[in-house]
Amino acid sequence: MADEIRTGTTPENTTDTTDGKAADATATTATSVTSSPSRRSVLGWGGAGLALGAVAAGGTAAALRTGDDAQPAAAAGDAMAFYGPHQAGIATPVQDRLHFAAFDVTTSDRAALIKVLQEWTAAAARMTAGHEVGSGAVGENDQLPPDDTGEALGLKPSRLTLTFGVGPGLFEKDGKDRFGLKSRRPQALVDLPGFPGDNLDAARSGGDLCVQACADDPQVAVHAIRNLARIGMGKVAIRWSQLGFGKTSSTTPDAQTPRNMMGFKDGTRNISGTDQAALDKHVWVSEKDGAGWMTGGSYLVARRIRMHIETWDRTSLQEQEDIFGRDKAEGAPVGKQKERDEPVLKAMKPDSHVRLAHPDSNSGATILRRGYSFTDGTDGLGRLDAGLFFIAYQRDVRDAFIPLQTNLARNDALNEYIQHVGSAIFAVPPGVRDSGDWWGKALFA
């Protein structure tokens, strides 16, 4: 049963054209893995169970194997490649839904932690390819808990990506070097400073490890985090998590720019996932940056930004546009006609968000944004708990997010309508190269 695949898939390269998704989906073809069959376990034929153990690949049957010596073959055209020089979920096309989880490592046993990371990697390779974890949701022994929780049965891969990172607490926590990694902490993995206006909730901040699950189907993303948490039970525990929807930035330039919960287009000038020069300059860690195990990786900053929705909704349109420095309908900068027209910063108010966030206002500081909107019900006063779950990737936070956020926190007119309530930083290692590699292997070498 381990190699059974779930059904419910669409023909390969099928895209959703709603709200500009088609461009992002089409862009996956360079990095996606394709194969012909559907992905649910095939049961039947006179009451007997039939496991689909091979698929046609280029006219040749290729057996699906579960061991460490084989990458699970993709079960549909919208499965993203798992192996590569960089982790997927950074520069790859942005999906519609997010489940982000930060974990505390509860064991002090180095070998036990390594085993969790190895099992996580194997499970991630299978789930991103559209397969069940281990022996599946209806495993071979019905007297034991199944290896897969089962809520993704019948769902297509939905371009699932799983992006793994390590936080400062993995290297030293409460003065203890639990895993002998203190000397391996990259200089760029700094503790973020306090910024003016921060009101951080410790329960929604920090973490020793993180996994960012992105997919076009929220249930696929939730299934991935749930199964990783189950695998790590007793060794790691979820510290906090966040669901997100309505991607607020795109890495695909020809995709329609998404809107945030304030109704404005968000991410117009984001780094393109196909601009290799910009990615090398601003996103990917190079060998000369130190910490060799991070070469090809990036640094992730996550910020939970709550919006004062009710106050914003009572603000005039003119004031809203002045605050952002763009018009609300088209997204054009002040004095321009089109969204992607080059902004004239001096034409904007000195405290406008676009002006203050522009690289020219921050000594060239540039980040790759990959955030999502969120709504988490209401607070005790009946106000909507909603906003932006901001995610940024960069080569070095000391040259990117920190100076950028310092400028915004001090001067941005938008601060009257938002508050940062959660924060975390993680070092995101390079991609898993092959089936013998695993998340964090070079760190523990």
Briefly describe each language-model feature range.
Residues 3, 41-62, 66-445:
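Long, histidine/aromatic-enriched segments associated with O2/redox biology
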Residues 1-37:
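N-terminal secretory signal peptides
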